[in-house]
UniProtKB/Swiss-Prot annotation:
GO CC terms: cytosol
Example of a GO biological process term: cytoplasmic translational termination
Family label: Belongs to the RRF family.
Cell compartment(s), UniProt: Cytoplasm
Molecular function terms from GO: ribosomal large subunit binding
Species annotation: Burkholderia cenocepacia (strain HI2424)
Record-linked InterPro entries: Ribosome_recyc_fac (IPR002661), Ribosome_recyc_fac_dom (IPR023584), RRF_sf (IPR036191)
Taxonomic lineage: Bacteria, Pseudomonadati, Pseudomonadota, Betaproteobacteria, Burkholderiales
Name of this protein: Ribosome-recycling factor
Amino acid sequence: MSVADVKKGVEQKMQRSIEAFKNDLAKIRTGRAHTGLLDHVQVDYYGSMVPISQVANLTLVDARTIGVQPWEKNMVAKVEKAIREADLGLNPATTGDLIRVPMPALTEERRRELTKVVKSEGETAKVAIRNLRRDANEALKKLVKDKEISEDDERRASDDVQKLTDKHVAEIDKLVQTKEAEIMTV
């Protein structure tokens, strides 16, 4: 293993942490409708659980309503049930074969709770990034101990790892701020 391998590995892992954090943020409901909110809803399709996007077309009817059009008429009730049981606080209404999912307006108290959740998720993501930094620095120290690199090389590499850490932590902060602003916008 070389310094380049360590740096490349830690950068890939940090990027995956950021992607996981973005997915977590997408699950947090804001006042506005977006189809990504239903991405994690699983529907019982002839005995197997599949993502809602594989059995229905998701569209935005307006700023506060998602339209869900199942491809098979017999799936309407199952899709509606899956949305209702997804623990998103949504109450779908069916008209014919179109399921309308209105987004209830968020109360001020609920908005504040959601911003706390976003901050907490952000802190968790930062801890994950810092843990990756620690692992990379330990790998670099092991390379020095095994006499594969000099201490100067290790110092330079750990500075590079720190720069990567700072960059990814700043990205998390930016994502948190954006999501908080989205939640607090009435």
